């Protein structure tokens, strides 16, 4: 029950942040805020999570497929390790963009030619390294992480609007909120079909 409450608390937190900074109505965000509390999987146990675990926060060994260091730990907290893993896996399914969240996207690239594993293999490698026989369905976690990222970007846009922050990329961030919400809703619908 504690794990379920934490998932609901996270959705409630990001929903409140989003609503406080909203500059327009985005139906997919409203759908996600209604759908997520009842559809996030029960947490797979608490552990230290990075909070911003993505490829550009990793230093990789130049001569072998090995992580040498993980950078930027300021968002670290206790949480669901699968949610942290799936945030990392978003690079494989994130719509490509020249600015902001999509700049690190691997979508449409030949990841194996880049020396990276396919998403399915990467997730399986994680499960094996973590001593897990399998992973829960990833689609609800993808829906949550796209929702969370959209809420974070909208929060920045809202602070710029309110004059409490400045960001030269605020327009580009604002332009990404809707596509991220659409991607989140896409994954929620995929979860319903699974």
Regions found by a protein language model. Give the residues of each.
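Protein kinase catalytic-loop region centered on the HRD/HxD motif
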Residues: 40-47
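Short, small-residue-biased leader/transition segments that mark boundaries at the very start
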Residues: 2-3
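Catalytic-loop of the protein kinase fold
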Residues: 48-50, 55
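Catalytic cores of eukaryotic secretory-pathway lumenal/extracellular enzymes that build
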Residues: 11-19
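Active-site activation/catalytic loop segments of kinase-like enzymes and analogous catalytic loops
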Residues: 83-131, 144-162
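Regulatory N- and C-terminal appendages and interdomain linkers associated
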Residues: 27, 151-194
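Activation of the activation-loop gatekeeper triad in protein kinase-fold domains
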Residues: 71-76
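Hydrophobic residue at the +6 position relative to the catalytic HRD Asp in the kinase catalytic loop
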Residues: 58-60
């Amino acid at each position: 029950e504690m794990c379920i409450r934490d998932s609901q608390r996270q959705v409630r937190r990001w929903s409140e942040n989003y609503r406080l900074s909203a500059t327009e109505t985005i139906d997919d965000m409203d759908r996600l805020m209604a759908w997520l509390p009842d559809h996030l999987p029960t947490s797979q146990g608490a552990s230290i999570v990075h909070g911003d675990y993505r490829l550009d926060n990793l230093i990789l060994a130049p001569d072998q497929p090995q992580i040498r260091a993980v950078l930027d730990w300021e968002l670290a907290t206790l949480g669901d390790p699968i949610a942290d893993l799936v945030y990392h896996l978003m690079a494989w399914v994130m719509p490509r963009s020249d600015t902001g969240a999509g700049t690190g996207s691997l979508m449409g690239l030949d990841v194996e030619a880049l020396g990276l594993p396919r998403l399915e293999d990467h997730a399986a490698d994680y499960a094996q390294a973590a001593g897990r026989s399998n992973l829960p369905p990833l689609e609800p976690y993808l829906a949550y992480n796209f929702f969370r990222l959209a809420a974070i970007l909208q929060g920045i846009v809202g602070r710029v609007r309110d004059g409490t922050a400045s960001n030269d990329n605020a327009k580009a961030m604002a332009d990404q909120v809707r596509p991220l919400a659409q991607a989140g809703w896409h994954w929620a619908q995929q979860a319903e079909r699974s």
